[in-house]
């Protein structure tokens, strides 16, 4: 079969607190697999005002270093793979304006949506848990 996009735009780093390995390890694995484009998309930081610390995303202070690290690796591996840097974000109105300003200020390439929470992670349920039961199609298999 031909025509498959050899790309991955949903790659997290250690900064999101639930990924393992270094950016370099991810890049080298992608090259070995024949991936042409690799996008890093850590969970976007949220500017929590009350001191809340997320367990699934980097802090606002880590964002510039994250973008810088991926950009530097992009230069190093430019002859082998195209790297992109962005964020995976939920649409949470109270944070969106500040997140968008940070995204623009840092010169990110893209943002993907991953609506893990219906509201802020402080006030809303983790919605991914709503979809963990088998699908109706899976229940009919023996």
Describe the role of every protein-language-model region.
Residues 1-93, 102-103:
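An N-terminally biased module of ancient metal coordination in phosphate/nucleic-acid-related enzymes
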Residues 24, 117, 138:
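Short, flexible micro-motifs
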Residues 46, 120, 139:
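Active-site loop signature of alpha/beta-hydrolase-fold enzymes
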Residues 50, 122-123, 142:
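Short glycine-/acidic-enriched loop or helix-start segments at secondary-structure transitions
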Residues 81, 110, 140-141:
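Secondary-structure boundary/capping signal
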Residues 90-133:
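Hydrophobic alpha-helical segments and helix pairs
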Residues 131-142:
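Single conserved hydrophobic/aromatic residue that forms the stacking wall/gate
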């Amino acid at each position: 079969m031909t025509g498959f996009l050899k790309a991955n735009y949903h790659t997290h780093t250690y900064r999101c607190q639930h990924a393992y390995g270094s950016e370099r390890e991810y890049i080298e694995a992608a090259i070995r697999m024949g991936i042409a484009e690799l996008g890093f998309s850590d969970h976007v930081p949220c500017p929590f005002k009350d001191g809340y610390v997320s367990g699934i995303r980097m802090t606002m202070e880590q964002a510039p270093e994250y973008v810088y690290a991926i950009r530097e690796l992009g230069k190093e591996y430019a002859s082998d793979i195209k790297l992109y840097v962005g964020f995976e974000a939920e649409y949470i109105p109270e944070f969106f304006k500040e997140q968008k300003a940070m995204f623009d200020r840092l010169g990110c390439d893209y943002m993907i949506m991953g609506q893990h929470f219906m509201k802020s992670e402080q006030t809303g349920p983790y919605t991914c848990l709503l979809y963990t039961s088998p699908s109706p199609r899976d229940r009919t298999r023996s």
